[in-house]
Amino acid sequence: MHRRSLLVALAVCGLAMSGRAARSAEPAKRISMLIGLPLDHPIVSARVAELYRLLAERGWVEGKNLRVSWRVWGASEVDLARGAAEVVAENPDIIVVGSSAETAAVLAKTRRIPVLFGTASDPVGSGFVRSLERPDGNATGFSNNDPAMSEKWVELLAEIAPATRRIGVVFNPHTTPAAGATYLARLRAAATGDEPAFETIQVTEPAAIDREIAGFAGKGAGGGLVFLPDSFTYRNAALCTAAAARLALPAVYPFDTFTLQGGLMSYAGAREETAEMLASYIDLILRGADVAELPVQFSRSFELVINEKAAAALGLSLPASLRIRAQRILS
């Protein structure tokens, strides 16, 4: 058994004696959530419902033995800092956050309350944990986009759009882990010869998305896009996919949120697996597990999602090799 899996199994066994019956007599546990998209967003509402279902399977029912509060931060770093301060002020049993940006904001406010991140691309390099196997602090969670995946995104882009000669790498340096440096280093190291040529496209406000991508497109033919994991572009997924479509640029995205909103293709850790792991860790921490001893988990399965309508609009045909490997084809 893998060491991380063994550690989790031991944590489960060690806490099982507490039992659900004993838990029901205790005051309701409290979770504070800090996320970047509104709860009425169709993708978010579906995933929230799934998380509640998984928690209920483990004996945690909202309104009975569980109280959950939500904070959605706005468009600026000031809003994010305010949201982080508010969830810390609630002094909950756990703070659950979505991305690296939210994790950093909350950890700047507390090193005491357990913090569980849903996705952090480089938790060690970002200073969230001391090591993956033993975080040794008040934060742990999951990572479904390792920097090594950037090479895979480029491979997929070349496969679906073989005429691509220039790749624009889109990200916000303020909300991407290490300002995108770890991803860019992997991309450049994987390049052979002069092609593809990489160009950074930095976007720091919604209005810049279309403008900066248009600037890249205007430099010549053969352009394509790779979007880095980034809470800013995630929040503005519809603007990102609309710009790529308007400018007829094939693009690969780091989350299926983009393909569900018209993007061409995404490759990332399976969302269902992340939800299952998140519910499992919430359960463990609420039952007394030490967050410092819960290893950071990585996705074990990955999902290739292709939007066939977007491909057709770009004049691209899906090769059989991609059709076979895709877990979902949206048509």
Where are these regions (language model features)?
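Short hydrophobic alpha-helices and adjacent helix-cap/hinge residues
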Residues: 1-331
